[in-house]
Amino acid sequence: MNGLHIALVGARPGSEIRQLITDHQAEITLDLTCTGIQRSYDLNSEQILPAYAHALLDQLPCMRMAAASNRQRILEAYEDRIDGIIYHTVKFCDIYAYEYTKLHETSNLPILKIETDATAQCGGQILTRLEAFLESLRAQKGESMLFKNKRQQSENYSTETQDAVSDTANAKTANTTDAPVYVMGIDSGSTSTNAVILNGNREIVASAVIRTGAKSGESAQRILEEILQKANLQRSDLTKIVSTGYGRVSIPFADENVTEISCHGKGAHYLNPEIRTILDIGGQDSKAIHLNEKGDVTDFVMNDKCAAGTGRFLEMMARTLEVDISELGPLSLKSTENIEISSMCSVFAESEVISLIARNKETSDIAHGIHMAIAAKAISLMRRVGLEPRFMMTGGVAKNPGVVKVLEEQLKAPLFISEEPEIVGALGAALYGLENIL
C-alpha cells in the first residue's frame, strides 16, 4: 500500500482541511465525518423523492442527532487499510469530544485531533500539526519526511529572491560527488529567523539568529547572506537548503521543508541523545514533544490558540512593567515574595499586573509571578506527552533564566539547554537535508 491512507472522522470540515491533506500527498481513504459518505440515487427513477430521502437518511448522522456507533464499526473494519486518523471537531460542538476520547483510548491507529471554528481561515498552527502528524506516519512507514517546496515566483518576490532561486539550481549543477557537502537549515519563526550550516561530517560550520520582521521572505534572504559570510562560503557551495517554521513555505530558495516539530526532535537528539521530553516556547506558540531512544517524535501537543505563555506574552508583560525583555529574567531572580498571576489570558493578565503595580508590589516579585504562571502552563502541556526525563528546553524563552529556574523547581529536574536554544529547529532541518543526500 503506497502513500498515506487517512481516515477523516468527526464533524464535517471545510474544504480547506481536505485540501491540506491531499496537498501533502495523503489520500482520504475513508471519510467518516457527519454527512461524509455520499449516497447515490437514480435521477431517472419514478420514485425520485423516496430515493432522494433514502440517500439522505443513509448518510452518517451528526452526533447531535443520532448515535455514531455505525461509523466506529466501519472504522474498525478498515483498520488494516488505514495509516492514521484525523479527527475534526468544531468549536463549541462538544458532543464530538466523547467519541474522540473513546477512539483515542480504543483504536490501535495514530490519531490527531484538530479543532476549527467553521470559518474560511485555516491557521498556520493547524497546518503545522497536520504536517507533523503526516510526517510521523511517513517515518513509521520508512518514507521520506521532506516535502518539496513549490517555487512559484509571485509578484511579491524581489529580484534578489528570484536570483537566490536561480542560484539554487546552479548549486545543484556545481556540486559533484567530489565537492564538499554543505547543507543549510533555516527556521522561519514568528519572532526570529534562525539558520545552521552543516558539513558532510554532521559538524556545525556556522549559525545565525536574526529578527523576522514584517516579511519572512526578506528575513530569510538576510540570514542567508549573513550565515554564508560567517561560514566563508558562496551560495553555490550549498548542496541543499531545508526550511522549517511557520514561514517555511515562504522561502522560495529552499529545496524542501519539514515541520518544526520534527526538526526540534531531530536537533535535540543530535545535541543530546538522552533527551526524551522537549519544551519549546517560541514567539506565538509553545509545544511539548516526546522522543523515543532513536530520536523519533512519538507524541506532541501544541498550545496555539492564543499567545498565553509564549514569548509574545512575556514581551507584553515586560512592556507593562516598563522593563526590557532581556532584563525580565534576571530581575525575577531577586524576588522575595511569591505572587500569583491567576489569569493566563494576555489581556486579563495585564490587568492583574497593573493592579499589582497599583498596590506597590515589587517589580521583581511581579516578574516572578509571571514566570510561575508560564511554568505552570508549560508543565501542564508536558504532562500530556509524559514527563519522561531527560528534559530539554528550546526557543527564545529558554534564554530567560527566571522561567528556566521556576521550571526546574517544578519539574524537580534540570533542563538541558544548548548554547543557542533558538537554532535547534534549524539544526534539525539541516540534519534532515543531510540525511537525504548522504
Protein language model features and the residues they cover:
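Conserved phosphate-binding/catalytic loops in two-lobed NTP-binding clefts
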Residues: L109-E115, E260-I261, E408-L427
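Adenine-nucleotide phosphate-binding core of ATP-dependent small-molecule kinases
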Residues: R71, A349-M382, E422
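Glycine-rich phosphate-binding loop plus the immediately following alpha-helix
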Residues: T212-S216, E293, T298-L333, E337, ...
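Glycine-rich phosphate-binding/hydrolytic loop that grips phosphoryl groups
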Residues: T128, L314, S418-L438
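Redox- and metal-dependent alpha/beta enzyme cores, enriched for Fe-S-associated oxidoreductases
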Residues: V9-R73
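N-terminal glycine/serine-rich phosphate-binding loop of ATP-dependent small-molecule kinases
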Residues: N156-E260, K399, E408-E409, A413-L415
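Glycine-rich phosphate-binding loops at beta-strand->alpha-helix junctions
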Residues: Y246, R383, L387-Q410, P421-G425
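Conserved phosphate-binding catalytic cores of ATP/NTP-utilizing and phosphoryl-transfer enzymes
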Residues: S158, D163, D167-D178, Y246-D296, ...
